[in-house]
């Protein structure tokens, strides 16, 4: 993970980053609570679908697992899927993690967040809700293989902001959406979304069959340069934003490029 905004702020402060006692940082755990999902996205690394899958953990086992993670020093838990909002005990699970003292985030496609449950989402006190947006309307709907999913995701972001929930936009970079990245970042500001997470294609599940969609190296370099530019703008203008990338440690090479 490359924390672009964090890195640029540390440069602006002109102070060394303090070392943590003990040397190693506590791990961040992304827990796919279930594989069931209401979408069949082209890039899905877990090949999720709207059906039951055998062998998944019972809620009691999940709660016990959270206790084990906390005992092992895990402080950050991201609840994902599948679509985590399809888990019948999601809010109980989130509450248990919060009671254990964890930072608890939700990673969702956003289509199941609506006026009927936004209050419950707010009451769960997620520290962060990440909602996927993989291009503008036509591109996103084609990528997610469901018409209307773009509008539903945007509506979810607006509802989260109105409920004072910290929300982020999550985008998987592909050849199909790379040219739309500037527009997505403009949309981020328009919606007052505080975080942007750029993911690279994971070659697993349906993502393995969609490798031809992966962004070429030039596209990736251009995207990273743009994220550095937008992050720097926001810092200079005092905006509360956070730009992060994931699924490719080579992104850190851009740090050198940004200062040549």
Please provide the spans of the model-predicted regions:
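Radical SAM enzyme [4Fe-4S]-AdoMet core and its adjacent flexible, acidic
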Residues: 1, 123-124, 134, 142-259
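Conserved alpha-helical substructure of the radical SAM core
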Residues: 2-128
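Glycine-centered loop/turn positions within well-structured domains
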Residues: 39, 138, 167
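Hydrophobic alpha-helical segments
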Residues: 62, 78, 91-94, 127, ...
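Short Asp/Glu-rich motifs
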Residues: 88, 96, 115-117, 140-141, ...
């Amino acid at each position: 993970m490359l924390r672009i905004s964090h890195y640029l702020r540390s440069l602006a402060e002109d102070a060394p980053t303090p070392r943590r006692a003990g040397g190693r940082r506590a791990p961040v755990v992304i827990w796919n609570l279930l594989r069931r999902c209401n979408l069949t996205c082209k890039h899905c690394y877990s090949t999720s679908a709207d059906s039951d899958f055998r062998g998944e953990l019972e809620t009691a086992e999940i709660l016990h697992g959270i206790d084990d993670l906390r005992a092992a020093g895990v402080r950050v838990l991201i609840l994902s899927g599948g679509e985590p909002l399809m888990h019948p005990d999601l809010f109980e699970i989130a509450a248990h993690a919060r009671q254990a003292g964890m930072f608890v985030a939700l990673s969702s496609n956003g289509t199941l967040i609506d006026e009927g449950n936004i209050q419950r989402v707010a009451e769960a006190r997620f520290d962060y809700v990440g909602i996927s947006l993989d291009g503008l309307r036509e591109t996103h709907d084609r990528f997610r293989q469901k018409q209307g999913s773009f509008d539903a995701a945007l509506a979810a972001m607006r509802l989260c902001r109105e409920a004072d929930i910290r929300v982020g936009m999550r985008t998987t970079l592909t050849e199909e959406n790379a040219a739309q990245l500037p527009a997505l970042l403009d949309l981020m500001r328009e919606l007052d979304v505080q975080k942007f997470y750029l993911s690279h294609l994971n070659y697993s599940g349906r993502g393995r069959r969609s490798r031809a969609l992966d962004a070429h190296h030039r596209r990736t370099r251009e995207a990273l340069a743009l994220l550095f530019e937008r992050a720097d703008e926001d810092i200079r203008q005092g905006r509360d934003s956070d730009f992060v990338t994931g699924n490719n440690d080579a992104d850190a090479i851009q740090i050198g490029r940004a200062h040549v």
